[in-house]
Amino acid sequence: LEVHYQFLENDDFSFGLTGGFRNYGYHYVDEPGKDTANMQRWKIAPDWDVKLTDDLRFNGWLSMYKFANDLNTTGYADTRVETETGLQYTFNETVALRVNYYLERGFNMDDSRNNGEFSTQEIRAYLPLTLGNHSVTPYTRIGLDRWSNWDWQDDIEREGHDFNRVGLFYGYDFQNGLSVSLEYAFEWQDHDEGDSDKFHYAGVGVNYSF
């Protein structure tokens, strides 16, 4: 469940706020036997868009999460912060360039806990192309720093990773509130421990604005 409220929106400055709640239910089998877990996540997330010049804008969002209940079972840290923010330069009505800094960090406010902590830092670059009702956006994610300790029960040492991605997003706006999208991405991952991984992502979306 998420609720968004737009406090202010005009060409010079926009500011909104999203609040949310999610429940996670787990049913699994481990060595001692069958078990269940039930975890909750609370979210608050401001977003903004600021006009710096006619062609240059500063925008982004910041999500703050709080996790509760059965964290030792699920392995999650109790707190998480995620943000993506940066600059967009518009060359003309067709072409723009957006370069963002992305951070996701899981940590524990309770000093007695260390499970589920991680950090991800990336540079994300987008090249939005607008052609009438069509929009095409090639993009890339370049890993700056990434580590995790998801296996804290067996090995408290942090494991380093290197994730990079290239992708393509396509959208079509029917100009009646309805829009559809297609997306494909390829990601390669290198790890301090274990083999490298490669992933293909594909997505289809339908959106309706009232």
What are these regions (language model features)?
Residues T79-Q88, N92-D110:
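Hydrophobic, aromatic-enriched interface-forming segments
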Residues Y184, D197-F210:
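Outer-membrane beta-barrel "beta-signal"
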Residues Y5-F7, P46-V50, D54, T85-V95, ...:
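Residue-level signature of outer-membrane beta-barrel architecture
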Residues R105, S112-V180, G194:
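Intrinsically disordered, low-complexity segments enriched in Gly and acidic/Ser/Thr residues
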Residues L1-S14, G19-Y24, Y201:
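Short glycine/proline- and aromatic-enriched beta-strand/turn motifs that initiate or cap beta-hairpins
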Residues N10-L17, D54-G60, E93-V99, L129-P138, ...:
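Repeated loop/turn-to-beta-strand initiation elements of outer-membrane beta-barrel proteins
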Residues L1, T36-I44, G75-T83, R105, ...:
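Residues that define the transmembrane beta-barrel architecture of outer-membrane proteins
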Residues L8, G20-A37, K51, S63-Y76, ...:
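Sequence/structural signature of outer-membrane beta-barrel proteins
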